[in-house]
Amino acid sequence: MSPKALNVRVTTMDAELEFAIQSTTTGKQLFDQVVKTIGLREVWFFGLQYTDSKGDSTWIKLYKKVMNQDVKKENPLQFRFRAKFYPEDVAEELIQDITLRLFYLQVKNAILTDEIYCPPETSVLLASYAVQARHGDHNKTTHTAGFLANDRLLPQRVIDQHKMSKDEWEQSIMTWWQEHRSMLREDAMMEYLKIAQDLEMYGVNYFEIRNKKGTDLWLGVDALGLNIYEQDDRLTPKIGFPWSEIRNISFSEKKFIIKPIDKKAPDFMFFAPRVRINKRILALCMGNHELYMRRRKPDTIDVQQMKAQAREEKNAKQQEREKLQLALAARERAEKKQQEYEDRLKQMQEDMERSQRDLLEAQDMIRRLEEQLKQLQAAKDELELRQKELQAMLQRLEEAKNMEAVEKLKLEEEIMAKQMEVQRIQDEVNAKDEETKRLQDEVEDARRKQVIAAEAAAALLAASTTPQHHHVAEDENENEEELTNGDAGGDVSRDLDTDEHIKDPIEDRRTLAERNERLHDQLKALKQDLAQSRDETKETANDKIHRENVRQGRDKYKTLREIRKGNTKRRVDQFENM
């Protein structure tokens, strides 16, 4: 390695990259190396951020050597690759999946750390999209209780404000997660951002400033323009200036001057605590204004090609998605059919077992009947024998008319005894005959049942041999554009591209919840659910401000429309009097 080579570590939202650069390497050369490595083409949104020697976060200057910038001396040198500028509408502007992912991760982190205020009900809904983006479709078999225990999904503020256990939070998020079934991970990220961009603090860079009266205020710089906030409320801007009203920005030391297009309006002037703050404000104003104007012009060839490629990729992905959905539907049908077969097979087995039991009972009954018939036949044989013996005795009696009286009496007694024995045997035969008839009836009934059971078993057996087919499919899933960087010292002035015919985009802008009835109902239901466990003693200042804004029917865009009313002069005067 050359002795002049320097080690550099660049942290993106989901990776760490390490490079060796030369002492002559510029910010742009390092930036280009990063975007080439991660495959990013929408470079205009991003920048390299570092911590300077004073501990402040600063954006690297592209056309200045890295070593000549006030980077904190470490080995390796530390940089963060972050979104510097935000789109007006994520759904319209973000082209590449990598761009979408980086924005999603950065915005999600800002919400979880409370850098962007997000009300509790919106936090839970966003968490459900975050789970879909990370884990895909909910699966009740693998995604059991405790599955989300290690995922960071909600701002700590929201958790602290509600008397809910971890399991209850998880169940709430999983309930909404199941609503997103079949949604691609990229689509879940996009839905997350579409909701997040309606949050008041989304995409705003805040700077501490003072007006001429010395009142401490906040300046907010974002994709739509400049806004002024009171010191204790960064949710609700009080005065707004769209980019289309501004023709020049400049600063002299700590004083920052904004010249409106309206020549009759006075300059808009404020004071920053340090000159370096004014440099950052100037750079952000220039970059946001440039992108604001660029959106209102035809796309460059590069962007057209990028969008065409993205459309092709999305169409291909859509086709794959449709194939996947068809495969999933086929799998569900096959699984349902298989379950039906298994249920029928189980029923058949139960019926066959029952038939087997009935058959065994019938066979046992037949054995008993056969035994009974044998006994009956033996009794009949014995009866016949005794009747013959009796007949012989009677014949002897008839022949022995001349017998002695004693012998005759003895013979008569023997005949009477034999008659009684014959009667007894006759009674037994009659009883056994009745029992035999009853058993014959039972056997006949058992045989009928056996025939019915055999027919049913045969039918079930025939059904179980129907061919089964299971089709299971699985599926998952440079041109450089210059970023404007303020490299200013002393008095700096920049004229901005203007067009008096540009319509303020805020005029027709509505929040997604206002435009989407389903989302509106989801948030309303979540708010009602969370209200039952809310601990009002844990409310923050932002919670109270948000609640009051909702009570008065305000949202991000309604507020912006309200504070941009009237001519520029009136708003400048209003600022001076704050």
From Swiss-Prot:
SUPFAM superfamilies: Moesin tail domain, PH domain-like, Second domain of FERM, Ubiquitin-like. One of its GO terms (molecular function) is actin binding. It is found in: Cell junction, Adherens junction; Cell projection, Microvillus; Cell projection, Rhabdomere; Cell membrane. Keywords: Actin-binding, Cell junction, Cell membrane, Cell projection, Chromosome, Cilium, Cytoplasm, Cytoskeleton, Flagellum, Membrane, Neurogenesis, Nucleus, Phosphoprotein. It is a peripheral membrane protein. It holds the Pfam family FERM_C. The keyword Cell membrane applies. Residues 463-555 are annotated as: Disordered. This is Moesin/ezrin/radixin homolog 1. It comes from Drosophila melanogaster. The gene is Moe.
